[in-house]
């Protein structure tokens, strides 16, 4: 079994990462397995204290622990596009993209295992089958899913080279002065609060374009385009310029009078090259219920 480390797991100790994946296995058992060379990173034996880096590969035999396989769950999927190699799904707000920590049910991966159990890439490991990129739990919208590893690599390369275009809608706090612009600030993990990302000197290059669509008394409706894809990128960038995403309590917005499942943010547009062809696919979706309710309220008060 192999797990590809994503940015969200970077800076975790090796023993902590493995313990979080397998809640029924004690930390001591995990540490013993690491010490005895049963758990490796990139094919090499490491200490339990080894700090993981993005794209590290954590490797061990399937039978090292009594691992319970993920359940395939009959969760409705809103599929916006599908061909023989991939699909694009519209993830609702409130749903995890893939299992994390003790949460191993009700995720998009659980739903995908029911929809196409034998047709999902496994580059990211058993818990991230098919997942090419992710959305935060309370961000809704479009996600690409790969049915095989070649397609997974093809789509990830488009994200890496910035040829895949991902656009979002957000309502942000405050009235933005500029009609459009670019935020180019490096992002890294907040070492005091591992749930947060921050603007960090020496962090990863992070670029977000924004365009104002509508202004209200205390909020602004914006379109955002990711040029890079860091964890919480839009949320961190907008907070850094004094306009946190509405209801994003983690990044300083507080909860407004219009209560929602946290941040008012959705991935509404996705443009990419169809795998192994020259055909350009563009998919756009309408406002989700959260955004509709917020915009209706703000327009009624304007």
Per-region residue spans from a language model:
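RNA pseudouridine synthases
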Residues: 1-302
